[in-house]
Amino acid sequence: MSGKQDLSPLGLYSSYDPTKGLISYTSLYGSGTTVTFEELQIFVNKKITQGILFGTRIGAAGLAIIVLWMVSKNRKTPIFIINQISLFLILLHSSLFLRYLLGDYASVVFNFTLFSQSISRNDVHVYGATNMIQVLLVAAVEISLIFQVRVIFKGDSYKGVGRILTSISAVLGFTTVVMYFITAVKSMTSVYSDLTKTSDRYFFNIASILLSSSVNFMTLLLTVKLILAVRSRRFLGLKQFDSFHVLLIMSFQTLIFPSILFILAYALNPNQGTDTLTSIATLLVTLSLPLSSMWATSANNSSHPSSINTQFRQRNYDDVSFKTGITSFYSESSKPSSKYRHTNNLYDLYPVSRTSNSRCNGYPNDGSKLAPNPNCVGHNGSTMSVNDKNGAHATCVQNNVTLNTDSTLNYSNVDTQDTSKILMTT
C-alpha cells in the first residue's frame, strides 16, 4: 500500500465542475439530505453581501446625521425632524439586521438542517424587532415625502392642486405603511408559531411596489418643479440654472436614482441578486430626503438661482434688504412679524403677466389695507404703495419705485425705517 493518500482522478479533468459536488448530511428530513457546494456558496455570498450592505447603511446614515446637523440652520422645523428620525431609524434597522445575521436564526446550520434547538428566543425577538423598525422607517419616509408635496404646493394660487396631490400622496403612503405592517405581522406570526415555516412574500412584494410608486410619484413632482422653475426664471429674465446645477438637482434632489433602482429590482431576474437593490434604493431614498427637502422648500424667484435651503422651511421670497440691490418679486424683513398674512404665488411657477393690471399694497399690523399711492406708477399702469413692517413710515417716491418690462422690481431711495416688504396682488 502506498504511503500517499490516493487522489481523485476527477482533478485531472478540466471539464469537471466542483461546485456540483454533493454534501450529504443529516437534517430535519433525514440522514440522506444532500446539497451542492454551489447552493452553499450562494447562501454564504448572500449573507456576506447583506452584511456589507447593511454595514454601509450604518456608516452612511450616521455620517448623514452628523453632516445634516452641522449644515442645518434651523433644526426645529418639522421636515428636519422627520428626516433626522428617518436616518436614525435606518441606522437602528441596519444594526438590528446585522445582529440577526450574526445570530443562529440566519446561520448556515439552521437554514440547511432546520434543527431549531440552537435558536433562542432572543434571536426570534431580534427578528421581530427588525421587521417592526422597518415599518417605522417606511412610515417616516412616507411622512417626509407627503410633507414635501404639501410644501411645494402650499401657495395660495395652488391650494386646489396641492390638496389633490397631497391627498394622493397621503393615501399612497398610508397604504404602503399598512402593507408593510401586515407583512411584518404575518412574518412574526409564522416565525413564532413555527421556526421552520417560510413567510409568504406576496404582501412584501405589494408593499415594495407601493413604496417604489411613492418614490416615483415624488420624483415626478420634484422634476416638474425644476422644469417650471427654469420656465419661470426665463420668463422673469433672471439668471438661469447652469447645466451642472440642473444635473446636480436631477441626480441628488429629485430621488431619480432610488426610483431607477426600485424599477430595476422588479425588472431584472431576482436570481441574479437584484433583491438587494430594494435595500440599496431604500438607503438612497433616506439619504436623499434632506437634499430633496432642500429643493422642495427652496424658492426660485431670487436673482441668483439656488436649490439649497438649509433653513428647511418654506421660502417664497428673498430675505434681502432694499440696500443690497438684489431684488425680486418678494422681499421680507429679516425679522418678520407673525401678524402678517402673506399673499403670494408660491415659487412664481406662473408669474404675473406683463400686461396684467397689478397693484402693490402694504398691510399694517392692525390688518387694515392702505390706499395705493397714486403718485407711484409702474410701466404697465400698475399703482403701488410701499410700506415697512410697522405700516407707519412708508412713502412712495414717484419714479423711484418702478415695475420694469422684465417683471422685476428695482428699489431706490425708499423711505423706510426697516427692511420693507412688497406683496404683489392681482
From Swiss-Prot:
Its main location: membrane. Keywords: G-protein coupled receptor, Membrane, Pheromone response, Receptor, Transducer, Transmembrane, Transmembrane helix. It is a multi-pass membrane protein. GO terms for biological process: pheromone-dependent signal transduction involved in conjugation with cellular fusion. The chain crosses the membrane at residues 50-72, 79-101, 131-153, 160-182, 202-224, 245-267, 277-299. GO terms for molecular function: mating-type factor pheromone receptor activity. It holds the Pfam family STE2. It is found in: Membrane. The keyword 4Fe-4S does not apply. InterPro entries: GPCR_STE2 (IPR000366), STE2_TM1-TM2_sf (IPR027458). It comes from the Eukaryota. One of its GO terms (cellular component) is G protein-coupled receptor homodimeric complex. The keyword Magnesium does not apply. Belongs to the G-protein coupled receptor 4 family. Receptor for the peptide pheromone alpha factor, the mating factor of yeast. PANTHER family: PHEROMONE ALPHA FACTOR RECEPTOR. This is Pheromone alpha factor receptor. It comes from Lachancea kluyveri. The gene is STE2.
